[in-house]
Amino acid sequence: MAAGTSNYWEDLRKQARQLENELDLKLVSFSKLCTSYSHSSARDGRRDRYSSDTTPLLNGSSQDRMFETMAIEIEQLLARLTGINDKMAEYTSSAGVPSLNAALMHTLQRHRDILQDYTHEFHKTKANFVAIRERENLMGSVRKDIESYKSGSGVNNRRTELFLKEHDHLRNSDRLIEETISIAMATKENMTSQRGMLKSIQSKMNTLANRFPAVNSLIQRINLRKRRDSLILGGVIGVCTILLLLYAFH
């Protein structure tokens, strides 16, 4: 009976790790899609400065469809991983050996933390993509209004020239913000790839920590230092972003 329940737990852990690996790859591709959409929007804006054609890029709709498809796939994977975590929670609540139950709870909490990180990263990337798309649609509408006004009143109209200059200034500021976002997303992708390598190492270290209390104490100190380094890195990135925004709107 004990062997059967142990096999059930290991099967759940195997399914959880497989879904986590799939989600990690999907989220990296999802982030790259958002970055490429941002770059294509910036190139489209620069092209519109020298052309009166206001027709959107053909690959915009293709990227939108790809975005919707990938978002649905990631949501389904998150739902499946949530279900696996719920089954693991039910198993830990019914485990009979207290010492074993403590070790299982530690493993379950680690899988829950990974699920929470993936969910937060997905919603953040999705929100960034939607914001870029809405901003591009808004700017496209503004460009159409400008072209319509130019055709009705003439290019030499003073008000039109002032409006166009202000529009160019806004486009330059918007492009600088997009480049800043791209740098931040590239940094996040590098950290995501590093997290994949560290995750397997941490899993082995956690297994050793459950067996040797001294190793567990060492791992806790390492985790505290890692969190401190993450806070410092996040603070530096935040300050750099604020400085770039201040420079852009100064």
UniProtKB/Swiss-Prot annotation:
Basic and acidic residues: bias regions: 41-51
One GO term (biological process): inter-Golgi cisterna vesicle-mediated transport
N-acetylalanine sites (modified residues): 2
Record GO terms (molecular function): SNAP receptor activity
Induction: By monocrotaline.
Localization annotation: Golgi apparatus membrane
Signal sequence annotation: none
Topology versus the membrane: Single-pass type IV membrane protein
Modified residues (Phosphoserine): 141
Function: Involved in transport from the ER to the Golgi apparatus as well as in intra-Golgi transport. It belongs to a super-family of proteins called t-SNAREs or soluble NSF (N-ethylmaleimide-sensitive factor) attachment protein receptor. May play a protective role against hydrogen peroxide induced cytotoxicity under glutathione depleted conditions in neuronal cells by regulating the intracellular ROS levels via inhibition of p38 MAPK (MAPK11, MAPK12, MAPK13 and MAPK14). Participates in docking and fusion stage of ER to cis-Golgi transport.
Oligomeric form and interacting partners: Component of several multiprotein Golgi SNARE complexes. Identified in a SNARE complex with BET1, STX5 and YKT6, in a SNARE complex with BET1L, STX5 and YKT6, in a SNARE complex with STX5, GOSR2, SEC22B and BET1, and in complex with STX5 and COG3. Interacts with GABARAPL2.
Name of protein: Golgi SNAP receptor complex member 1
Source organism per UniProt: Bos taurus (Bovine)
Organismal lineage: Eukaryota, Metazoa, Chordata, Craniata, Vertebrata
Protein encoded by which gene: GOSR1
